[in-house]
Amino acid sequence: HRDTHSISLVGVKNISSTDIEKWAHIDHSSAELTEPSSPVSIESRSEHEFKTREIIQAIKHGHVYQVNYGRRWKAPLENDSWSVFSKLSRANPAPYSSWMRSPSLKWSVVSASPEQLLRIKDGIIRTSPIKGTTPRGKDPVEDAAKIDSLIRSKKDLAEHMMLVDLERHDLSSVCEPGSVVWSDFRIASHPNVHHLVSTVEGLVAQGSELSSAISSLFPGGSITGCPKTMSMSIIDHLEGTSRGAWTGSMGHINSTTGIADLNILIRTLDVRIKDSKNIGSVMAGGGIVHDSIPSVEVEEAEWKADAITRATWGAPAFKDNLSPPTAEMGVLALPMSPSNDKNANFTLFQKIPKIILVDNLDSFTF
């Protein structure tokens, strides 16, 4: 907990407190860091570019609008997952960071997630999707230019608004009719990247179950695509293997108070024990649309993964061993209505008597 600097343990009834203390002591003890291995990308840059072009072709043929493709880095892990989490939290603090260890499953998850899947409190359900990312600049002037470029990017804004519409639709299935609104639009600045972030929220409908709310939003639209079912089919075909923890969710649910808060597991390290060795896996990617540039998509995946690979193995996710720029965190509110700036990309369309109906099966219809 950020305010109390404490960690809550979630367990089962009738478990001895001494067992919990023993477990916590073993796992939270500070281990001496050892010389790490270097992560290996499971696919080459050229393979990543090829798969990006495959997705673009699927979009041009009308099968899908957007697909979030992920690439994997993998290597043995000499340090325990808690040490990695501690280092990552210092180097790349994030609002929805989380850590989990299951000895029986031989599995640990370390995450510095900046993204919220859902929050339910006082009868209001909220989701805060991220879509649109740029690396930080090397100085304040370049950093401001990066933000300006992101705000004016037609591609990023189009992707983001498509996602906002998708989340509004998904929330509508568990909210009171007419209560779902796009309530906030902002730039969230993290140590290594700037993100375009929105908040979509609504009043939970009478009789709606928490499980229904989770089902309506999971998996998040930002890490699948649109429409979801077709996007996930393409992802399954091109990625070829399970994502593991990446793009899953971790958080807390209080059945007594009805409060829930769940993240989306991006910027995440997945650790599995195989043959008595810890094997770490990191995935990163981005949303592919019709005008995506394959080489740019490859670079985006690499600098998204970079903070995790450096904290885990002390090595970059890309060939050039250059330290990416870092800066202070912050939030910049963005306008949610048409702007007087002629160069801005927010356009108010005139009302017309004709409409086009597009049925996207499992996502949204407009």
Predicted segments, located by residue:
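Localized chelating/binding microdomains
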Residues: 349
